[in-house]
Amino acid sequence: MSLNIKKLALKSFIKKIFKLCGWNLIKFRKPPDPNPYGKISFELLKKMNDCKGILHLGAHRGTEAEVYNWFGKKVIWVEASPFIFNELKENLFFYKNQIPLQALLSDVDNEELDFYISNNDGACSSTSNFTDEINKSVVYKGRNFKMLKKIKLRSCTLDTLFKKNNITSTNYDHWIIDLQGAELKTLKGS
């Protein structure tokens, strides 16, 4: 068992003990850079302001929650990784109009799929494994990404996720999709 997996198991165990005592650990992080992607356009701000709600697929830990709250938007967050999902729930605890859901989105319901947990804080976890070709590509070259663990998850279509959770899709007209290569399959399932 690798050191990272042992750390995850220990962290999970400690959190469970605290929860049994009625306590909750909240991780304080350095806030992200104001905008690592460059200048925000007025057009983007207007779209965020004018939308009814936000559907964020590939939530990770929900670092954008404060921004969405600032706009006063209701948000549905979807994250596949069960390890990251618990932290997502904790991070969204104070945002009552933001709902976290755990699902591996695809174009078929209830299909058992391999889901690879990556290093890089789990941010690149995916149904696709890193190959040497991917690691040498322009996007990933020199980053040393790798998958640490493979788990089995059942897939769910976006339509099924909406039905199971009584979500009206038209209430969420601003979509952010970052599913590490599963974007097209997810859209086919909607």
Give the role of each language-model region.
Residues S2-S190:
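Phosphate/nucleotide-binding beta-alpha loop and adjacent structural elements of enzyme active sites
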